[in-house]
Curated annotation (Swiss-Prot):
This is Large ribosomal subunit protein bL31. Part of the 50S ribosomal subunit. Pfam families: Ribosomal_L31. Zn(2+) binds at residues 16, 18, 38, 41. It comes from Cutibacterium acnes (strain DSM 16379 / KPA171202). HAMAP family: Ribosomal_bL31_1 (MF_00501).
Amino acid sequence: MKQGIHPDYRETTVVCTCGNTFTTRSTSQSGTLNADVCSKCHPFYTGKQKILDAGGRVARFERRYGKKN
């Protein structure tokens, strides 16, 4: 690798909106990153995931032409 062209790779604190914080490494200049979701509050990881059927294109097709079994 060429010397002097790569940004510094330093420890960075990631702060989630739920209040969870953890340390990782990044090239961020500020030393902190703000995240909207993390593994502590994301529905997929917490098991609180809801499956919503909004009646999309597939449901509309099935209503129109009948669902074939």
